[in-house]
């Protein structure tokens, strides 16, 4: 932290960025993320957290929320909103054992308002609707089965994603181990989590407690992935730091490093935009943790702490220059990036159904619409997964597409597990490829940032899109990558879709077109603030043209660019709002 930063303003490379945001004060005064959270837990007058603690609990993996469906009714009754928390677990690579699954299933059933488990685009699970009296129990339950929620939210490195590829089992295992190492290396070192939630022994904090993150932590959230081409299921360009696995004869030899991706933006603020990550080059395995720390510390020191809307790594690269940032990383890591090794992303969806791995084990990928595991009428999905967990000897793998893989199934167990899955609606041969390639964030009723529906909106919207595709004779395999996010923060990753809807107001969305199937192109806004009916009319007209004018094998997103319907985004800062 520079002297100017200490005096409540920030200067980076000679440029004064301005006074520090209030979040910087909050973190600096938090006593390494402790704040007064413990005192707040004892306050039963309110179901929420007050003042700074509302923000600080994010570093412990929680967001304060309320049920927005009943907010107005409670206000009429002179009641405060139904405050509760959403917890996001830390699960690098998304692997969870059957024993762990049964424990989280039990907690969700007995101690959450909604009784559901939500698989998320961060390749983990979320509990929604946990009331204040149950929060400590929640953390202690997770701790008893070897799970925590440290740093899954807040201005830190979040849950590390890893390609869910059980077919290439040896390579996946190597990549997964690196995802875990990176996660551990970049974790906050403060003991605040154990002290508050696990009744751990209190220790005196020291200046050296956060050697990588610093006492003010990062300027903004930071997301990391480990990805195994040709699968881009983690959507590398949605993340700050990506390690692209490079293999030789099936053995991992190093990584290409991609830095500066991110999708969040702010409506009507042209200084914000989604951005693809830059390719810095190749590194050998032994430099992985050094490079991870160097990227994080460079962003820690150079990221914008004055304006949180411009605080992410993508804006730092555009402000100081990608080459300058890269050179600083090389200096800090003691490495010289080599020329990137060749790789290609050809797909990013999950292979739903059974696949056989090279080790002879079988893996069943279950499509979970929007990641919501709940016992719906006629489709007791949550019970079905629990029943599988009772007999399964392998593990479960949550995917960044919000699906669930039953991994490591011996041939002798296949029929039994499939029977359970079908009986509980977890396997349905009638689910279209279009539905499998559509995704939404949570949005209403629990997300406080949601401007429009997403999860509850998507199922019927997909049905309508399916009808349009059928009407124009589009084959099943030529579906469209379709994503909906309830606000411009981008949790639904709509800014890497062929058709992306971004919530603007209740019942209204911005329509973005021009992404591609591999997730390597940012779509651009086509129509602003339109209704779902208007969106479907637009899609109908576009699909009609696509069906009539497409080149052989041409995907929808590629067609919209070639046909001049939308301009391609090459450089986001220049092109996205042009």
UniProtKB/Swiss-Prot annotation:
Catalytic function, reaction form: hydrogen sulfide + 3 NADP(+) + 3 H2O = sulfite + 3 NADPH + 4 H(+)
UniProt: [4Fe-4S] cluster binding residues: 441, 447, 487, 491
InterPro entries given in the database record: CysI, NiRdtase/SiRdtase_haem-b_fer, Nit/Sulf_reduc_fer-like_dom_sf, NO2/SO3_Rdtase_4Fe4S_dom, NO2/SO3_Rdtase_4Fe4S_prot, NO2/SO3_Rdtase_4Fe4S_sf, NO2/SO3_Rdtase_FeS/sirohaem_BS
Region (Disordered): 1-20
Manner of cofactor binding, per the entry note: Binds 1 siroheme per subunit. Binds 1 [4Fe-4S] cluster per subunit.
EC number: 1.8.1.2
UniProt binding sites for siroheme: 491
Keywords from the UniProt entry: 4Fe-4S, Amino-acid biosynthesis, Cysteine biosynthesis, Heme, Iron, Iron-sulfur, Metal-binding, NADP, Oxidoreductase
Record GO terms (molecular function): 4 iron, 4 sulfur cluster binding; heme binding; metal ion binding; NADP binding; sulfite reductase (ferredoxin) activity; sulfite reductase (NADPH) activity
Domain of life: Bacteria
Pfam families per UniProt: NIR_SIR, NIR_SIR_ferr
Pathway stated in the Swiss-Prot or TrEMBL entry: Sulfur metabolism; hydrogen sulfide biosynthesis; hydrogen sulfide from sulfite (NADPH route): step 1/1
Alphabetized PROSITE patterns for the sequence: NIR_SIR
Bias-annotated ranges (Polar residues): 1-11
Cofactors required: siroheme; [4Fe-4S] cluster
GO biological process, one term: cysteine biosynthetic process
Gene Ontology CC, one term: sulfite reductase complex (NADPH)
Assembly, per entry: Alpha(8)-beta(8). The alpha component is a flavoprotein, the beta component is a hemoprotein.
The protein's role, per its UniProt record: Component of the sulfite reductase complex that catalyzes the 6-electron reduction of sulfite to sulfide. This is one of several activities required for the biosynthesis of L-cysteine from sulfate.
The family this protein is said to belong to: Belongs to the nitrite and sulfite reductase 4Fe-4S domain family.
Name assigned to this protein: Sulfite reductase [NADPH] hemoprotein beta-component
Species this chain originates from: Vibrio campbellii (strain ATCC BAA-1116)
Lineage: Bacteria, Pseudomonadati, Pseudomonadota, Gammaproteobacteria, Vibrionales
Gene that this polypeptide is encoded by: cysI
